[in-house]
């Protein structure tokens, strides 16, 4: 099995992080991997905002928790986060941003960093608070929040791989090597 396939199978969402800072060199590698995600027509319209400033990270966590209706830390104590946003006027921005998120999480796992996709970025950046945050960074185009990639060193044991609930199967297959599969259709 290639390393990529192994990383895909063993990566887990981490929900307990150590407070230790991640070296910038490692964050740079994770971000670079995100920029290599497939994207519609090669437009590369997704942006990544790195947040390692604790005060700003805590402010974002508070806003995210408010949206969720909670008072806890939705980022599970992660000392760093990468916020992924897609340009709203691009038809594939949600898909493109989702692929970036996947690359970020796989790269983090490969580099020994835990990660977790945290939702509610869309709601954050639709708010006046979120638009002001983007403006403070000089981001003036219309962007939609896709997700937050919470990053940090795992606090405790790395979670075990959970067996899949079902075996993979092809429900429909078109081609000359087509063989009927359970509950599937086959056209030659």
Q: Language-model segments: what does each one mean?
A:
Residues 1-188:
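Acidic, surface-exposed loops and disordered segments
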């Amino acid at each position: 099995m290639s390393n990529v396939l192994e990383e895909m199978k063993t990566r887990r969402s981490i929900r307990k992080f150590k407070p230790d800072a991640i070296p910038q060199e490692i964050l740079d590698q994770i971000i670079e991997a995100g920029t290599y995600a497939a994207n519609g027509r090669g437009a590369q319209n997704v942006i990544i905002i790195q947040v390692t400033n604790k005060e700003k990270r805590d402010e974002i966590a508070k806003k995210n928790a408010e949206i969720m209706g909670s008072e806890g830390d939705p980022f599970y104590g992660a000392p760093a986060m990468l916020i992924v946003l897609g340009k709203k006027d691009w038809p594939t921005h949600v898909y493109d941003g989702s692929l970036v998120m996947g690359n970020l999480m796989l790269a983090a796992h490969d580099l020994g960093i835990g990660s977790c996709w945290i939702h509610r970025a869309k709601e954050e950046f639709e708010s006046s608070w979120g638009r002001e945050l983007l403006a403070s960074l000089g981001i003036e185009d219309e962007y939609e929040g896709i997700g937050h990639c919470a990053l940090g060193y795992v606090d405790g044991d790395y979670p075990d791989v959970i067996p899949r609930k079902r075996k993979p199967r092809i429900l429909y297959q078109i081609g000359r090597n087509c063989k009927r599969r359970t509950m599937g259709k086959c056209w030659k």
